[in-house]
């Protein structure tokens, strides 16, 4: 190529590369569809409620150090607040086909996961264990360890051969052999120290659990003014979404309900096919752990809406 053409080409190439990269990363144009919604909104079936305040949950168990209370129950998940008093420990167990994960609301626990070095999970930690990997936890220190735990609905734990199963009404435990285990990867890590890594360290949130069954997403953002009530957010087909507030203050608008203002430890629940909007509120940062099944799950938005609300 003649030299006189090289200089103009050299000037143009960086712009072409930038355009190509932008095209690869740009979000595709949204598609229009008629999405089905029931005429009568899906109900809040017990124990599910629009808002469960942590203060009320703790008040119901005042004076007790060992307790469990189911806050969420859907086709896909059961979510429980569980408190273990000082010195208490779980048996070593595992779950057949799904990850179990939890957020530590208060206290400290020693977590032992087969194949990992034991670690201490304190306030704000997120912990997860893949399917068929034995694990146990033990409260350390002088105060109860309180966690919000999410696992597959309707599943009874399994136990290694050396452990004695805890009796479950209507179930028996039989001697078996099996193969195969879940694993950790670039997204699914044993734990996230939210305070150290995210709040102080500046790490981004994003997916903490992501596999073919579960998406548990850490969403952190500064507070914003309350949008118009005509800004509905989005809805999902055939599954509910729920959240635990990990930091700051948040506002939730759920179809058919008044505006919800939630704080750290509160549980918020949106039934399937109901419009819902979740945003950080106030002057600081707000963080929520959003739990949905079957990623990447479909979000239906209002025409012209900003995707991601």
Where do the protein language model's features map onto the residues?
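A short, N-terminal "cap"/entry segment at the start of jelly-roll beta-barrel domains
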Residues: 24-78, 91-92, 157-226, 232, ...
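Bacterial N-terminal signal peptides
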Residues: 8-18
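Short histidine-centered beta-strand/loop micro-motifs
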Residues: 70-71, 90-96, 113, 138-140, ...
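Short, conserved beta-strand element in jelly-roll/cupin
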Residues: 83-84, 94-111, 220-221, 235-252
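A short hydrophobic beta-strand segment most commonly corresponding to one strand
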Residues: 142-159, 269, 283-301
């Amino acid at each position: 190529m003649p030299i006189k053409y090289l200089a103009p080409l050299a000037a143009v190439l960086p712009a072409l590369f930038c355009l190509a990269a932008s095209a690869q990363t740009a979000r595709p144009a949204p598609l229009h569809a008629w999405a089905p919604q029931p005429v009568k909104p899906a109900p809040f079936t017990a124990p599910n409620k629009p808002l469960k305040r942590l203060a009320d949950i703790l008040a119901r168990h005042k004076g007790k150090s060992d307790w469990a209370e189911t806050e969420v129950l859907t086709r896909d998940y059961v979510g429980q607040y569980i408190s273990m008093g000082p010195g208490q420990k779980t048996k070593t167990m595992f779950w057949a086909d799904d990850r179990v994960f939890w957020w530590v609301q208060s206290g400290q626990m020693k977590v032992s996961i087969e194949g990992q070095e034991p670690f201490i999970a304190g306030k704000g930690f997120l912990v997860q264990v893949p399917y068929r990997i034995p694990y146990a936890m033990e409260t350390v220190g002088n105060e109860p360890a309180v966690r919000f735990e999410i696992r597959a609905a309707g599943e009874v734990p399994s136990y290694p051969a050396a452990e004695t199963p805890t009796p479950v009404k209507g179930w028996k435990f039989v001697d078996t052999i099996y193969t195969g285990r879940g694993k950790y990867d670039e997204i699914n890590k044993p734990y996230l120290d939210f305070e150290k890594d995210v709040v102080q360290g500046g790490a981004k949130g994003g997916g903490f659990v992501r596999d073919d069954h579960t998406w548990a997403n850490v969403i952190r953002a500064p507070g914003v003014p309350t949008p118009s009530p005509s800004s509905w957010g989005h809805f999902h087909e055939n599954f509910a979404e729920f959240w635990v507030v990990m930091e700051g203050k948040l506002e939730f608008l759920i179809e058919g309900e008044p505006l919800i203002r939630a704080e750290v430890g509160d549980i918020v629940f949106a039934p399937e096919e109901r419009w819902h909007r979740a945003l950080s509120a106030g002057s600081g940062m707000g963080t929520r752990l959003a739990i949905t099944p079957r990623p990447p799950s479909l979000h239906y938005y209002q025409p012209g809406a900003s995707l991601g609300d």
